[in-house]
Amino acid sequence: MAETCKMKYSVLDSPLGKMELSGCERGLHGIRLLSGKTPNTDPTEAPATPEVLGGPEGVPEPLVQCTAWLEAYFREPAATEGLPLPALHHPVFQQDSFTRQVLWKLLKVVKFGETVSYQQLAALAGNPKAARAVGGAMRSNPVPILIPCHRVVRSDGAIGHYSGGGQAVKEWLLAHEGIPTGQPASKGLGLTGTWLKSSFESTSSEPSGRN
């Protein structure tokens, strides 16, 4: 019988509003935007410094690591490349599924300053024809920003919707990382060769961008 997780919570005041982090001793379970601000999409304006508003005593190490990672991200996104990632223990990461495979590929392959299309991410996850399933995986992402579903865009460059806080939040995150919007996805252009390009061109079943 699986052991029930003893959940703990903490709150971070970020440039996007208050964010709730949830997790147990074994890993992070979720990142949730509690109250949205109207993000300033001007990338030349420095974001407000994030502030930890507190939580229960004895915050598990995965929440401590996630807080440190998010604080660094909101100060300077590139600085997160050298930081440890918290262990992840949401049920979606405990199941052998295409959703888990997509989320892991997105986390490990699509780095700061890059974007990827639904079709490209489907190919990276092993099924080039599963672009619509990738859209479903983005909606199921329990840890947005950490697993960067905001970097997943349509093939034509349209950014689409964003279940992690809405289109304005997605635009802010892309601008914060210095990623231009309205341009084709940048991932794969020399990463995996011509097989990716041919796979993308042979599939047309791309979701409407509601992730």
Swiss-Prot record:
Residues recorded with modification Phosphoserine: 14, 205
Keyword Phosphoprotein belongs to the record: yes
Location (main, coarse): nucleus
Active-site residues per Swiss-Prot or TrEMBL entry: 149 (nucleophile)
Region ranges (Disordered): 35-57
Cellular component terms (Gene Ontology): nucleoplasm
Domain of life according to the entry: Eukaryota
One Pfam family, short name: DNA_binding_1
Keywords (A to Z) from UniProt: DNA damage, DNA repair, DNA-binding, Metal-binding, Methyltransferase, Nucleus, Phosphoprotein, Transferase, Zinc
Catalyzed reactions per annotation: a 6-O-methyl-2'-deoxyguanosine in DNA + L-cysteinyl-[protein] = S-methyl-L-cysteinyl-[protein] + a 2'-deoxyguanosine in DNA; a 4-O-methyl-thymidine in DNA + L-cysteinyl-[protein] = a thymidine in DNA + S-methyl-L-cysteinyl-[protein]
UniProt subcellular location: Nucleus
Record-linked PROSITE patterns: MGMT
Enzyme Commission designation: 2.1.1.63
Binding positions (Zn(2+)): 5, 24, 29, 89
Family matches, as PANTHER family: METHYLATED-DNA--PROTEIN-CYSTEINE METHYLTRANSFERASE (PTHR46460:SF1)
Protein name: Methylated-DNA--protein-cysteine methyltransferase
Species of provenance: Mus musculus
